[in-house]
Amino acid sequence: MIEAKDVIKTFRGGALAHRRAVEAVRGVSLALEEGRTYALVGESGSGKTTLTHLLTGLLVPDSGSITLDGRAIAAYPARERFRAVQLVLQDGKSALDPRVNVGRSIAEPMINLGICAKKEAMRRAALLLRAVDMLEDAFHRKPAELSGGEQKRVCIARALSVQPRCIIFDETTAGLDVVRRRQALDLVRSLQRERRFAALFVTHDLAVARYMADTLWVMKDGAIVDTLERPFSSQSIHHPYTALLMSEDDLGVT
């Protein structure tokens, strides 16, 4: 479905000569297939966010390619990219319009993309709220009236509303306690198995990655330094950074 081949993305240093160019993504190759779950793990500044923006078509690589069904993803109209690949961000509150109630927030993508008329979109929004284990009264509430965990569930429901082929979860469980983190991850796992979208977790938290992923990529200094497949045996580790991550891992979600 989505494939990256030898992707490089460099950010120039700007007008001042002493500011060197930064190679944020260096020769990355990976593939995402529907029905599978992936994780991209790395510390802050490792290039995860840049790679995420490349995979969604928000950025264009300097060299290499990122394709959706064999066609450059950036060549698709924005509406088609938006429908195929959804991004669920870390901060649910800032991702939701504070002026709009929850039901409308979930329905709007369906209306704006012409998936269905307003009445049907609102009906589907109510069903999606149930799918993410939210009570019916949340439909008419504003984002500020919800907890952080509830806001993230609404964002997941909104992402599901356009029936995407891939959802990228960018630090989606950050800020949740252990119990709510486990609940959120189990919810996504259940939805992914039912709806068969590709799920990519972008995280600094190896515990989340190991709990969710079939395939785990470790990113450091803009490059994928290790690719691990479940059950993530230490014998498949090739890079010292991955070994360090594994040694420090506190699952917390088992």
What annotation goes with each model-predicted range?
Residues 234-254:
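C-terminal boundary and immediately downstream tail of ABC-type ATPase nucleotide-binding domains
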Residues 56:
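Helix-to-loop junction immediately C-terminal to a conserved catalytic motif
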Residues 142-146, 150:
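Conserved ABC ATPase signature
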Residues 120-137, 247:
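Conserved ABC ATPase "signature" region
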Residues 41-43:
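The feature captures the beta-strand-to-loop junction immediately N-terminal to the Walker
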Residues 16-19, 72-86, 100, 104, ...:
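ABC ATPase NBD coupling module
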